[in-house]
């Protein structure tokens, strides 16, 4: 069946991008047809209409305005769609020159995917948007990642077990891989909410990949960037190939690849990141996370660096020391720190502005952002230059300079507040280009220019009544009376004034100068815009030529922001510099949980109860706190706060404590909290066992492990056995530093059997039948769990609480007396019978109790007391 030329063009383009929604530009709208329209209308909640017919059926259609398309794009990307953006490559007028029925040329200019976003409105300014690439060459594996909005480009070798933890660390938006690996990676991608995209195997061919990398960076060999495995080269090459596909050949500005190693940062698995709520709270948002509480950065790049440091605490002692030295310097120089932050507040997002310009998605406002950022950089250079700086800040200082020429050029070229888009014009400063100033003058002041010319012609001819007028037939012309016209028609005036028309009373002339002016006025607006666009392209080239140095400056500004932010945090919240070394120490005095402390401060003003922790261990030995105590007493908070303090220390931050000594930690593991995995048919207990198994199989002697309530999801003796064996394994095999919280009081016996285990408990106090949580950790074991009291605090009905006390008393009595088996005790409890009886009403006071209440022991002689005892015994057992 025949289709219209426009629909034929659409179908041809759609066939090339079958797996994406096609945004087909038609004037001021992007339109979608057929299945794309149905899917987009549902995803965007917009009207589904129809346009024409195909094979006898209506063609579904929907559309979105071009000016607001970014918001719709963001919605589609978040719902895991890929969008092919098809633009008009010529105007309708240009198309008609090829024939009255010619269709406007269109082509896809970009494939929008979750990992290739650059627009400011589509991205979180304080979070990286990573595109990751997994490759395998024989038995070797590698992971590469880039953020094309900032230019970051990294690669690392990988073992199969480390893919999940690395994806958890990076939190990428998209993962690309060979089509043959898609099925193997689908589950892990779904676990982390990552869009998975398969590419042809050729994209990961290491030989062609190496050439693509060399071509991108304009080098003959990769040797200057380091030594890479074939798998690493393949992973990087896959990224470049994918960017070439999605950006239609216009590759972004990427920095040379940085090779990372697995032991560069603390290994933290996904479960631990989730449990500790490092960058995201369990509720799913940023609020309530560690990042939200400690982030004092004031630039977008500084915010991204803060997030990256929390996600990737270092294992390199020199790196940690340099960061701590920088924070100490900023804290010690309070006035300087304040001055630096005042200037940093004026620093825009240089990285993303630069990236948008390189991809032709930027505009004059991005140029102004670079100008303003570099201007503040120069001021910061002067501010810091007079101080003796620690190494990290000295390196940053070196990267703040060397932009004077570009700053001068940008200052001279751009207006103070340019528009967003180059197509609007009005962004080149007056006085920069004489030709542009003339065009603008003609465009904006055409009448006054004509008036001045009229005065000049009147003076030249001596005809004061001479006028310059305009009509749609002649355009601009000089008009005078027939009497005065004779003078202008005769030499020498006739050489200047050219006769155009004679009417009954008037004679009209023109001049070469007036004709040229008319052309200039008519074309002035378009000409001014063309000149601005030409100057824009020249200025963009100048900026991109300095892109490497601008990127270095952006990194230095982010480092300054992070350093001063951490110093400000330390000062305002009373944090101290930790001692970090190669030892096996772990000694914290008056440690606090920063998130809980912040919540208390905001909600009630109550102080956080600080606690000590000493897990310092000898080489090749474990040190474990076995923590007991009631629910709600603060065990989980204590576990988490010590893990967070260790993490903060190794990211290069001060810590919430009065003193801290941390021997380097290689891994951080956490098994805290309960959750099930219904999608995979895993119970809470199964999830707990899987996470515990991962810890026992991977933790080394430099790991810090926190375990909470291992074994609680199964039968009591099963759970106790698992918890007991887990603790022994941590002590004897893993030899880790660990905090192990449990309700199994029987386990406290291990402190006397294993040299590296110490009992600790969270203290409580009973007052008039109620429990008071003191939240203090002291050495020793808890005497009971206070579960019934906690249940009462939670609001269980009084009858339930009363019955629970009775059951607990009977069970504890049976254990003490040892005269009944567990089965006998349970059989005696109506609670466990087939038809349980309701909880009994409180018993009436007995005769014995009544007589006891009347007795005054101090008034009895020994003989009277003995006689009374026999009487009471007889009354109790009639």
Swiss-Prot record:
Protein name: DNA mismatch repair protein MutS
Chain residues that bind ATP: 629-636
Pfam families noted in UniProt: MutS_I, MutS_II, MutS_III, MutS_IV, MutS_V
InterPro entries: DNA_mismatch_repair_MutS, DNA_mismatch_repair_MutS-lik_N, DNA_mismatch_repair_MutS/MSH, DNA_mismatch_repair_MutS_C, DNA_mismatch_repair_MutS_clamp, DNA_mismatch_repair_MutS_core, DNA_mismatch_repair_MutS_N, DNA_mismatch_repair_MutS_sf
Record flagged with keyword DNA damage: yes
Similarity comment: Belongs to the DNA mismatch repair MutS family.
Transmembrane segments: none
One Gene Ontology term, aspect cellular component: cytosol
GO biological process per UniProt: mismatch repair
Chain's role: This protein is involved in the repair of mismatches in DNA. It is possible that it carries out the mismatch recognition step. This protein has a weak ATPase activity.
Keywords: ATP-binding, DNA damage, DNA repair, DNA-binding, Nucleotide-binding
Keyword tRNA processing: no
GO molecular function: ATP binding; ATP-dependent DNA damage sensor activity; damaged DNA binding; mismatched DNA binding
Xref: CDD domains: ABC_MutS1
Gene3D superfamilies, alphabetized: 1.10.1420.10, 6.10.140.430, DNA repair protein MutS, domain I, MutS, connector domain, P-loop containing nucleotide triphosphate hydrolases
């Amino acid at each position: 069946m025949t289709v219209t030329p426009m629909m034929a063009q659409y179908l041809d383009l759609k066939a090339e991008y079958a797996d994406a929604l096609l945004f087909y530009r038609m004037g001021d709208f992007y339109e979608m047809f057929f299945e794309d329209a149905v899917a987009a209308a549902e995803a965007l909640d917009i009207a589904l209409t129809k346009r024409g017919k195909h094979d006898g059926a209506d063609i579904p259609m929907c559309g979105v305005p071009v000016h607001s398309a970014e918001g719709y794009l963001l919605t589609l990307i978040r719902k895991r769609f890929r969008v092919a953006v098809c633009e008009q490559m010529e105007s309708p007028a240009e198309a008609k020159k090829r024939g009255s029925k010619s269709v406007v040329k269109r082509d896809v200019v970009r494939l929008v995917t979750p990992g290739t976003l650059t627009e400011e409105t589509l991205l979180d300014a304080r979070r990286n948007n990573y595109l990751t690439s997994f490759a395998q060459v024989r038995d070797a594996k590698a992971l590469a990642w880039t953020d094309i909005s900032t230019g970051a480009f990294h690669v690392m070798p990988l073992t199969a077990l480390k893919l999940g933890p690395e994806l958890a660390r990076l939190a990428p938006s998209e993962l690309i891989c060979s089509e043959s690996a898609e099925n193997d990676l689908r589950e892990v991608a779904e676990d982390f909410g990552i869009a998975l995209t398969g590419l042809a195997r050729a994209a990961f061919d290491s030989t062609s990949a190496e050439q693509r990398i060399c071509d991108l960076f304009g080098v003959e060999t990769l040797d200057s960037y380091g030594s890479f495995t074939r798998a690493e080269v393949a992973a990087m090459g896959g990224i470049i190939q994918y960017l070439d596909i999605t950006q239609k050949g216009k590759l972004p500005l990427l920095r040379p690849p940085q090779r990372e190693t697995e032991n560069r940062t603390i290994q933290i698995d996904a479960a631990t990141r989730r449990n500790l709520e490092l960058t995201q709270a369990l509720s799913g948002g940023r609020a309530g996370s560690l990042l939200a509480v400690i982030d004092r950065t004031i630039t977008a790049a500084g915010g991204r660096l803060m997030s990256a440091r929390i996600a990737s605490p270092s294992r390199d002692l020199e790196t940690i020391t340099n960061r701590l030295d920088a924070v100490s310097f900023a804290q010690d120089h309070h006035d300087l720190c304040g001055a630096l932050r005042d200037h940093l507040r004026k620093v825009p997002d240089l990285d993303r502005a630069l990236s948008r310009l390189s991809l032709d998605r930027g505009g004059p406002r991005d140029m102004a952002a670079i100008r303003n950022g570099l201007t503040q950089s120069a001021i910061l250079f002067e501010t810091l230059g007079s101080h003796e700086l620690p190494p990290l800040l000295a390196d940053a200082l070196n990267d703040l300079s060397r932009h004077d020429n570009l700053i001068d050029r940008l200052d001279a070229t751009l207006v103070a507040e340019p528009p967003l888009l180059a197509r609007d014009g009005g962004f080149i400063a007056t006085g920069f280009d004489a030709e542009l100033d003339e065009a603008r003058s003609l465009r904006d002041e055409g009448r006054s220019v004509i008036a001045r010319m009229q005065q000049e012609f009147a003076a030249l001819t001596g005809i004061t009544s001479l006028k310059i007028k305009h009509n749609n037939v002649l355009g601009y012309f000089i008009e005078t009376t027939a009497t005065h016209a004779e003078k202008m028609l005769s030499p020498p005036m006739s050489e200047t004034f050219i006769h155009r028309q004679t009417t009954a009373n008037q004679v009209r002339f023109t001049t070469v100068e007036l004709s040229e002016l008319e052309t200039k006025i008519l074309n002035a607006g378009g000409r001014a815009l063309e000149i601005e666009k030409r100057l824009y392209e020249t200025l963009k080239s100048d900026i991109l030529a300095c892109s490497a140095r601008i990127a270095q400056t952006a990194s230095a500004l982010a480092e300054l922001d992070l350093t001063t932010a951490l110093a400000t945090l330390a000062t305002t919240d009373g944090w101290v510099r930790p001692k970090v070394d190669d030892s096996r120490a772990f000694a914290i005095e008056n440690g606090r949980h920063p998130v809980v402390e912040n919540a208390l401060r905001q909600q009630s003003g109550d102080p956080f109860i600080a606690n000590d922790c000493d897990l310092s261990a000898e080489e090749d030995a474990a040190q474990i706190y076995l923590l007991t105590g009631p629910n709600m007493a603060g065990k989980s908070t204590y576990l988490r706060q010590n893990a967070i303090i260790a993490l903060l220390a190794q990211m290069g931050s001060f810590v919430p404590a009065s003193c801290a000594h941390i021997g380097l930690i290689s891994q951080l593991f956490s098994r805290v909290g309960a959750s099930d995995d219904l999608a995979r048919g895993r119970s809470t207990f199964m999830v707990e066992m899987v996470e515990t198994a991962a810890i026992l199989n991977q933790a080394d002697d430099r790991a810090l492990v926190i375990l909470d309530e291992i074994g609680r999801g199964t039968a009591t003796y099963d759970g106790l056995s698992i918890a007991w064996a887990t603790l022994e394994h941590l002590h004897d095999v893993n030899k880790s530093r660990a905090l192990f919280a449990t309700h199994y009081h029987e386990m406290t016996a291990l402190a006397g059997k294993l040299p590296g285990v110490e009992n600790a408990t969270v203290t409580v106090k009973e007052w008039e039948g109620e429990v008071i949580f003191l939240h203090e950790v002291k050495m020793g074991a808890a005497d009971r769990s206070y579960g019934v009291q906690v249940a009462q605090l939670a609001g269980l009905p009084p009858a339930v609480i009363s019955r629970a006390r009775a059951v607990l008393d009977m069970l504890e009595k049976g254990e003490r007396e040892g005269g009944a088996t567990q089965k006998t005790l349970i059989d005696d409890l109506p609670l466990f019978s087939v038809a349980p009886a309701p909880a009994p009403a409180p018993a009436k006071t007995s005769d014995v109790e009544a007589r006891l209440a009347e007795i005054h022991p101090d008034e009895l002689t020994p003989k009277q007391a003995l006689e009374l005892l026999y009487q009471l015994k007889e009354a109790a057992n009639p």
